[in-house]
Amino acid sequence: MTEESLNPIVYSKNVIEFVTVANEFCNLVEHAGQEATRSFLNKTQKILPLLYLKVSVLEDLNSYEELGLEKFVSEVDYNYLQQKMMNLLGEFDDFQEVFDPGMQFSDEPLSASISECLADIYQDLKDFLMTFRTGDELVMQEALWVCQDNFKNYWGQRLVNSLRAVHNLMYGDYDLDQAMNQERKSEDVEAESNKPEWLNQLFKDQGE
């Protein structure tokens, strides 16, 4: 394929940079639990603003509605990764939500979960990345449009909400270095035993 024949949108500088950052975010989520809570939050604090920036500068696209895109992240995969992050964050996972539409119908403060927000972002980004790897430029462009649309209407708000909570943890008076209690350890071991097979092979050729 010559340089002139490449799709000018899906191979543009902004798209390639977004793909790179999205891949780094997904790697962070997939390896949650392999490092300390503070280290995970420190990396999350840095990559979320970068991810927001990279998707915000993408060119607006048109949708090819007749294209049905495959979903790669199953409910089992989602629950496994969300549980891993919840175990890692422990008592720091929950935070008070201030941008939930349901607040207008509730007299009580609504709570949200960092791990759930990150898992929601991951699900859209991983589906996008896996579709993008097909090399079909029309499908790649549609996947990019879907990812942008979901960002505008859903996971972009989840991103900024979770970033607010992470910022509070990083700079608040919290003992993020405390060891996990026995219950969290037991849950972590159980989650590890149920690790989906696709995680072992998903990026086995990455770096080759």
Each language-model region and where it sits:
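Internal, hydrophobic cores of structured domains that mediate oligomerization or house catalytic pockets
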Residues: 2-8, 94-137
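Charged, amphipathic alpha-helical oligomerization/scaffolding segments
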Residues: 13, 17-24, 43-50, 54, ...
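Residue-level recognition of alpha-helical structural elements
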Residues: 36-40, 114, 136-140, 144
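N-terminal functional modules and adjacent low-complexity/disordered segments of proteins
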Residues: 1, 90, 194-198
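N-terminal interaction modules that seed assembly of large macromolecular complexes
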Residues: 2-4, 9-74
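Long, low-complexity or tandemly repetitive, helically biased scaffold regions used
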Residues: 32, 53-107
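Acidic, proline/glycine-rich low-complexity IDRs
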Residues: 109, 124-208
